[in-house]
Amino acid sequence: MPNKLLEVKGLKQYFNVGKKNEVHAVNDISFHIYEGETFGLVGESGSGKSTTGRTIIRLNEPTDGEILFDGQDVTKIKDKKGLTKFRHDVQMIFQDPYASLNPRMKVRDIIAEGIDVNGLAKSPEERAKKVDDLLRTVGLNPSHGTRYPHEFSGGQRQRIGIARALAVKPRFIICDEPISALDVSIQAQVVNLLQDLQREHQLTYLFIAHDLSMVKHISDRIGVMHNGLLLEMGKSDEI
């Protein structure tokens, strides 16, 4: 039986608590993800799926519930060092490849952020080699490292975001609508790249999207969200 890499138990994410405009963005949901699988989380805009992803990686402070990663409850991590270690294992690819890359940084420095924070390169030469290798891995040329994000297309920028996520050699990646901002012609290329990387690096994915057909294509199991609730869960060919 594969290992449960992630377990979400009774997760609640409320905003404006105690006020008239209190929002129950995620309302008592539970699911687990096995090591090596892709779990798709699908739902219309405002269903709570992206909030779930952001709460798992602790960009939001959960209102209630447990988030177990490899058996450790990450909601109990309070220190910066502990969070840095957690984000070494868990990375996120964001929906908007335009907004998620710093426009004032060169691509090589964007990709190397995690390498620098975690001290993964012992010299400038090793850092440069790691970045070049990552650019090649996502189908870009090492020479692209000297350019800025605005010089790239949406699909290329998303590849840069994927390279940044891979830089720290994570075990688990949250893909938050990684293709919805891209042209349809580019979407399949990015999905195929994610699948290739999963095989090569033994990655586990939480794949968040509103397009059920694309989620079914990439996922082993799927959860369907609506109004903060997880309404349905099962194998991708049964949803």
Task: Name what the model sees in each region.
Residues 1-239:
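ABC transporter nucleotide-binding domains
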